[in-house]
A protein has these predicted regions:
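Alpha-helical transmembrane segments of multi-pass membrane proteins predominantly involved
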Residues: 1-222
Length: 222
């Protein structure tokens, strides 16, 4: 069984959707492309949820890629909830796109890229993988927040989100570098042992862990 099969399928499907929409844009109008991408996006997300259901319970508590990706109960149910909610949003998004006069097909692709980043974040088992997954979904959300270029509110929201995201990412990276310098590892399982066994007088370890936690909380709030 392949633990990251849903992520692999979603990533390969996204590459196909990008190529499909790019070549189709030469011959067709954007509204037609958007409808095609929307239906294909719903199908891809539905199949990804099925892959999570089909393979998730069979490979629980297993890891791949040198323990950077893990499949446990938390990641399984988190991916299932994220995939279901995203599928529900895609099914309801067409009236909003028509009402807001958004004809660009990239809107759907950005949502799928954000879902891919969230899937990887749920399965990440070290700081580097978690950071890359956070940045993948954050970049998609930056563009989605400022997608309506003619709206002052949309552009303002995108700029504020970008600044907050950059600040929280810097805190996360700074705390991660300090933790790696002190412990020599970036694995979450080893961090759990460190957090449990850290002595009360060791303020350096506690402050480094607090920086990473503060960065994660700041990312979630923003």
């Amino acid at each position: 069984e392949i633990i990251i099969l849903p992520e692999l399928f979603l990533g390969i499907s996204l590459v196909y959707l990008v190529l499909h929409s790019t070549f189709l844009a030469v011959r067709k109008n954007y509204p037609l492309i958007q409808s095609s991408i929307l239906y294909l996006g719903v199908l891809v997300l539905f199949l990804s949820c099925l892959l999570v259901l089909n393979d998730g319970l069979d490979v629980l508590e297993q890891s791949v890629l040198n323990d950077t990706i893990v499949n446990d109960y938390v990641s399984f149910f988190s991916k299932l909830v994220i995939g279901s909610l995203s599928l529900f949003c895609l099914l309801m998004i067409q009236p909003y796109l028509i009402n807001q006069k958004i004809n660009q097909f990239e809107y759907i692709l950005l949502i799928l890229f954000a879902v891919l980043g969230l899937f990887l974040l749920c399965s990440s088992n070290d700081l580097l993988t978690a950071y890359l997954a956070i940045e993948l979904q954050s970049l998609a959300f930056y563009v989605l927040a400022s997608f309506k270029r003619n709206s002052t509110y949309s552009v303002d929201a995108g700029i504020k989100y970008f600044i907050l995201g950059a600040f929280s990412s810097s805190l996360f990276l700074f705390g991660s570098s300090l933790l790696y310098g002190v412990t020599g590892t970036i694995n979450f399982e080893e961090f759990k042992d460190l957090y449990v066994n850290v002595s009360p007088g060791n303020n350096a370890d506690l402050s480094n862990i607090s920086l990473v936690q503060f960065g994660l909380v700041f990312i979630l709030i923003s």
